[in-house]
Design a protein with these regions (language model features):
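A short, solvent-exposed beta-strand micro-motif common in secreted/extracellular proteins
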Residues: 78-90
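Asparagine-centered strand-capping/turn motif at beta-strand->loop junctions
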Residues: 39-43
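Bacterial N-terminal signal peptides that target proteins for export
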Residues: 1-8
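Exposed aromatic-hydrophobic patches
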Residues: 68-76
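Short amphipathic beta-strand segments in non-cytosolic proteins
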Residues: 50-57
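Short beta-strand/loop motifs in extracellular/secreted proteins, especially
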Residues: 45-49, 81-83
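C-terminal motif of bacterial Sec signal peptides marking the signal peptidase cleavage site
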Residues: 15-19
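Extracellular beta-sheet/turn segments enriched in Thr/Pro/Gly and aliphatic residues
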Residues: 21-28, 93-124
Length: 124
């Protein structure tokens, strides 16, 4: 009984360890790779999307309800700290919060109803 338990434990450890193989190295994106902003508007009104970073405010465009807008962030806005996205509808606005971006990443900005439920995530 003790031997079977030891063999079972050893087998499980070998199985778990085989999943820890070497990962392929991913090289960083070139410094001139664009940063894409993908905005999905789940809100009930058209939203104007603005990016603010490095003391620059840049209007990206308008995304209508139920639509997806894809934009490219100007290179001058990257590297000097964080970037924040805002979606504005008159007096109401959604914000992404500060995002630390690097060349080649994609930002998914989901505008939700109510606006304080909006989210942003960064992916490679």
């Amino acid at each position: 009984m003790h031997r079977q338990l030891c063999l079972l434990t050893l087998g499980l450890l070998l199985l778990a360890g085989s999943g820890c193989g070497r990962r392929q190295q991913v090289s960083p994106a070139p410094a001139d790779s664009p940063i894409r902003i993908v905005v999905t508007n789940h809100y009930t009104a058209p939203m104007e999307v603005v990016a603010v970073g490095s003391n620059i405010s840049h209007r990206l465009g308008i995304v209508h309800p139920g639509m997806v807008g894809e934009f490219v962030l100007p290179q001058a806005m990257v590297g000097g700290g964080t970037v924040e996205l805002f979606a504005v509808d008159g007096a109401s606005r959604a914000r992404s919060g500060p995002l630390l971006l690097s060349p080649g990443v994609v930002v998914d900005f989901a505008i939700r109803n109510p606006l304080y439920n909006s989210t942003a995530s960064v992916r490679p």
